[in-house]
Each structure stands twice: as structure tokens, then as C-alpha cells.
């Protein structure tokens, strides 16, 4: 999809891409309510041509209540992906050093089945 942008508008590295992504809630007039991680397997990374997992914000307008009908009009992929969703009891703000597994697990309040409808 980035190939569709003029070269001068494409992010030049991952940091620039994340900076652009940080502006998405304001541009979309929505609010970020969580995070997702894409391309968590080597096969998934190879499929989309990336070298590692990709973080992304989850916007409130794209979250649906249990039992909701999700329209696929305009959706290019027309697939549903099963996911595992975690609700956190506390925020884990960004930090320079990686967090330990124990610290992250201690912050998890609950685990839920979820579905993603990627586009």
C-alpha cells in the first residue's frame, strides 16, 4: 500500500512510520483504546515483506460489541482472523528496556477470544 504514495510522502524508516501512526487517532477523529501486534510469525512477516512484528493502535470506532454485525462493504481482504485479546489492569508506558515476561503477565487483568477483520 505504501507504493501507492508518492515517494516523498512515504515514511523513510520505522520510526517515521510510527510517528505517522501516532497521528492517526486525531486525523480519524477517533481515539486509541489499545494496541495490536501484526506479523508475529516468520510466515506472516514473509507474507507482507517485513522483518519483524508490527505494532498498531486499535481505534474505538473499529471495535464492535459482542453479537454485532460487521459489514464487509469496501473491505478488500474479506477475511476474519481469530485473535487473543488481553485487558490490562495497569498501563505499561513505553520504556527503553524490554519488559520481563513476569512484569507483563502481572499487568494482565483478563484474556478474551476476539476476531479481527483486517482490511
Stretches with model-predicted labels:
Residues 1-119:
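Catalytic-core "active-site belt" of small-molecule-metabolizing enzymes
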